Amino acid sequence: MNRQKQSFDNCFEVFLADTPETKKIHYELRYRVYCEEVGLEDKRRFPDQQEKDEWDNCAVHFLVRHRYTRQWLGGIRMVMHKGQVFPFQESGVAFERLSRDRYKNSVEISRLCIIKEARRFALRNTSVDVTEESRKISFLHDCGNMNRNIMWGLYRAAAIYSARNGIKHWYTLYNPALASLVKKQGFDVQQVGNASPRQSSREPYYLSVKKILENPLWLEDYRNDFRMYSDIDKEAGRRQVKQIGVVSYVARA
């Protein structure tokens, strides 16, 4: 099997969601996750079926879509501080306040979610001719693997954006399983606080943007740059956004 054809870069593309249309995609995806799938948010609060909050006005959003189907598969946001406060600090976690200078070049990573159809789209409409048995043993063989591939693609795009814009520090909330997954992939993840009763087992972690970009993971794949959706919009005119699928994975913050 030609695995190169099934690399992240050959199957997917990452966009900076810099238009109202693409931000709406993220909000709708989040609604499906947090309101319909997981039930972490009350859907009655979002009659327009867009899960969003006051932090979205000071956030940068990224989306992943499949190159061939144009299906949107996942998203993430980077939140800038507001009054020297990040969203996770309002959740009650035990966390030492950052210095004023530290806030200037830090962000919180949150609202990571990936749809269930990611695995199916990974092998659809590619130039690879694979048998049913080959599909079963493919390196994209389960949703867990695909979730990780898309997660790393989103991380890579967010890290590149961070470096270009003087952002040096990431803060995020992980549960133990997700923290372990990120560590196993070679990322230097440091726990910087403790969970609160409201956050269950999720605890605050720190990642250095410099060290994220030094991860050997990027040497083999994820080499393509993210694209600004507004540039695509200008080239092709208004695109109709495809309906997002059923969500199977979410890391909420």
Name each model-derived stretch:
Residues 2-50, 61-63, 72:
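Short amphipathic alpha-helix that is part of the acyltransferase structural core
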Residues 11-15, 24-28, 141-145, 155-157, ...:
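Short acidic/polar alpha-helix capping motifs at helix-coil junctions
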Residues 19, 67, 81, 117, ...:
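Generic structural motif
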Residues 22, 36, 66-70, 160-169:
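Secondary-structure boundary elements
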Residues 44-101, 107-114:
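Conserved donor-binding loop and adjoining core beta-sheet/short helix segment
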Residues 83-189, 193-208:
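Acyl-donor binding region in acyl/amide transferases
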Residues 188-245:
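Accessory, usually C-terminal, subdomains that scaffold auxiliary metal cofactors
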Residues 247-253:
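Charge-patterned, long linear interaction tracts outside catalytic cores
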